[in-house]
A protein has these predicted regions:
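Catalytic machinery of carbohydrate-active enzymes
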Residues: 1-313
């Protein structure tokens, strides 16, 4: 999901330089809500690789794959740009039957993917994802990259959840990789400090394990932390858009908060702060680094700093 959020400014860039173009976005079915938030995306082409690979030989799956291939071929695109650089995304780009552009094999996560493209570009994999994706699209289409003109362009109406009083903070505590989790005790301490400042906290989850983790945090700060019901990505975006601030580990929802322009603090534990720091049009900060676990005091200080910056912006 983080890759999708990081690619959103590309849609704005392309429409800025080619306002009359029709822009399609290929996206996995579980993440369609994210590009739908952008007014610069005209059409979605939906894949289901996570589901397909579980039953790849069934006739229904083969039919779905054929339908996607047909849709891509019949669209008669002028160009396809693969921002993700995986074998499966390179294959999808090839299905369109037109020029496909991707990363060179020295700068791609799965080097075999480079062999599927019509043209490759040496866009460094050492760039932060937002800059990498914007650079790739700019070089592929021949327009200048303007780093100061970052625009995610999300169209989201804020929503305060039932049972939550404003102001509230959105805490994105879960992630698919255990090494990126911040210790539960530190989340509890942050939630208590927020409560002392009159700020409730809301938590999100996507499976039973994540819900249990959220409930353990909430039980340590009774009445001040609300574990929300399972929500769609669209609904989560609306809740985040209504928050006073967002604090979260390196996960897609945290980057979504930054994309929405909410004062945000990213907590890095098991990834590179150089590559995965938050990038926003508004006030944001990142604390910690790979193997460097930040203290609650650092997170709270960063939160107060971004809130102060947002207040004078």
């Amino acid at each position: 999901m983080g890759d999708i959020v990081h690619a959103l400014p590309v849609a704005y860039d392309i429409k800025k330089h080619y306002p009359d173009c029709e822009l399609s976005w290929v996206v996995e079915e579980s993440f369609t809500d994210i590009p739908k938030l952008s007014p610069f995306v005209d059409k979605l082409v939906v894949t289901a690789f996570r589901r397909w690979r579980k039953n790849i030989f069934s006739s229904s799956v083969r039919g779905e794959i054929l339908a996607v291939r047909r849709a891509l071929a019949e669209a008669k695109y002028d160009i396809v740009i693969d921002l993700q650089g995986l074998i499966r995304t390179a294959v999808v780009a090839r299905w369109a039957g037109v020029e496909s552009v991707g990363y060179s094999k020295e700068n791609i996560k799965e080097p075999l993917a480079a062999h599927f493209y019509s043209r490759t570009l040496p866009v460094s994999n050492k760039l932060v994802p937002v800059v990498r994706y914007r650079t790739m699209a700019a070089q592929a289409l021949g327009y200048p990259i303007e780093n100061e003109d970052l625009h995610y362009g999300l169209d989201v109406k804020p929503m305060t959840p039932t049972g939550v009083r404003a102001p509230y903070a959105a805490l994105t505590v879960n992630t698919s990789r255990a090494e990126k989790l911040w210790p539960k005790s530190r989340w509890t301490e942050v939630a208590r400090e927020l409560a002392d400042d009159g700020i409730m906290s809301v938590l999100f989850w996507g499976n039973d394990k994540e819900r249990a983790y959220c409930e353990q945090i909430a039980s340590s700060v009774p009445g001040q932390v609300v574990v929300l019901p399972r929500l769609s990505l669209r609904a989560i975006a609306e809740v985040i858009a209504g928050a006073r601030c967002l604090l979260g580990v390196d996960t897609g929802l945290t980057h979504l908060g930054a994309a929405l322009g909410i004062p945000s603090v990213g907590i890095i534990v098991g990834t590179s702060a150089e590559l995965f720091s938050l990038v926003s049009e508004s006030a944001c900060a990142t604390v910690g680094d790979n193997g460097v676990i930040p203290q609650p005091e650092e997170v709270l200080a960063a939160m107060h700093s971004v809130l102060a910056q947002a207040a004078v912006a």
